[in-house]
Amino acid sequence: MTNEQTDTDVGIIGGGPAGASMAAYLAKAGVKCVVFESEIFPRPHVGESLVPSSTRVFRDLDFLRVMEDSKFPRKYGAGWTSAAEAPVYDHDWDGLGELDAHVDGPNLRFEERDQPGVNQIYTYHVDRGKFDLLLLQHANQLGAEVYEGVRVSRVDVNGGPPAVKYNIAGRETGTTCKIVVDASGRRTLLGNQLKIRVRDKVFDQFAIHTWFENYDRTTWNRNESQKDFIFIHFLPISNSWIWQIPITDRITSIGVVTQRKNFAKTRESREEFFWESVGSRPDLLEKLRAADQIRPFREEGDYSYAMQQIVGDRWLMVGDAGRFVDPIFSTGVSIALNSSRFAHRDILGALETGNFTRAAYHTYESTIRRGTKNWYDFIQVYYRLNVLFTYFVTDKRYRLDVLKLLQGDVYDADEPEVLAKMRSMVSVVEESPAHPWHKLLNDLTHDAFRPTF
Ligand SMILES: Cc1cc2nc3c(=O)[nH]c(=O)nc-3n(C[C@H](O)[C@H](O)[C@H](O)COP(=O)(O)OP(=O)(O)OC[C@H]3O[C@@H](n4cnc5c(N)ncnc54)[C@H](O)[C@@H]3O)c2cc1C
């Protein structure tokens, strides 16, 4: 290990899932690391439904036991509902055969596909206040130093040992480290500072969400095994949907997601907007009106972006600090955890060799870019032509390939075949006005977003 003199080996900005898992990985490997978190945990946070690829990280970090003891609702799969059933099943498609008579529409159970390295058929829905606190405490127990209530103002990254700067009692002070990890989430501390953040030109979604008690979420279950599924309810408004995520037996998180152009301008009208949107699904409205709202509404705005660079000399970005892709498939926490899983290996290598240049983090950079690109392409096709997703899920030849993506297994070297197939189908539908699905195309263009890096 290099014997360069700094206050700590690795400075980590942010103690959410990305920062806490990074700290836990490094501390477990005996690396001296410090987390600076601006909030005092527990604090509320959006992003409550996990995907199963998170389990590998929990297992690596000896954290699965904590997840089990905490009694978070188990998530066995996902279901989708729409106001009127789209004409999914009536169309024939060259290359897709008879639909499998045994599948029961647009829902999936994780147990249908074995996942290497994941030995349970469920993942979890989490109260993020509690989950993030537990993971950060776990990192601390493994040996990471954790400072809450410390907001990092900037990082000096000029090629030499980075200095993490923050104010204590009105005075700027700092900590030097060999490598700095930005895990500041959508605040993207380093991305803003270095001016390398690129707004996503395709996705400009907004969300408004809250928690309800005594909402009868079983209404949507087709059978008992779907208890505690996540449900995505489509609205008859372009690119708009509602999430339904179990938080406890009695509490359910509900969020409306829509495009910027649909979103209300003022706070009051946003609450009205929430209820009007829910009202476009009278079946949902009736159930929610009968329930008790137990938290104020929270909003998340225009959140999709990428970075021109996610690693540099002596710095790395993990989780949302490096990229945000639309959350329709509950991907964010899994990407955050897995980015730390991949990145910490390169950091260990750099500390061992003393080579802290950008090249030292190449494996991480290429792996995480590949994974998020797969998610991104999948999400884009999905928004462009929802019906295609349902069609693939109900075709037994493709069902498991789609499930693999939804389980969060997106980091293989080769692009998933099903994505190429979906993309080519979208192109054909776009070019054929007479095609029965043409009128179902949504207004997000299929490949409008072309990263320039
Ligand atoms: C509408 C919406 C719905 C979503 N739904 C889901 C979902 O169902 N499932 C899912 O997996 N994901 C979902 N996500 C995404 C999920 O919220 C994020 O991907 C996830 O929280 C990323 O973790 P992170 O650790 O990178 O960032 P965060 O969880 O945001 O953590 C970053 C931490 O850094 C701290 N911080 C920020 N700036 C500083 C600073 N200057 N100094 C010190 N500390 C700082 C913050 O206080 C915060 O605690 C959703 C996101 C949105 C917007």
Listing of model-derived features with the role each one plays in the protein:
Residues 19-20:
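N-terminal Rossmann-fold NAD(P) dinucleotide-binding loop
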Residues 45-88:
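N-terminal FAD cofactor-binding segment of flavoenzymes
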Residues 81-179, 183, 189:
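Feature captures the FAD/FMN-dependent oxidoreductase FAD-binding
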Residues 345-453:
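C-terminal helical "tail/cap" subdomain of flavin- and related membrane-associated enzymes
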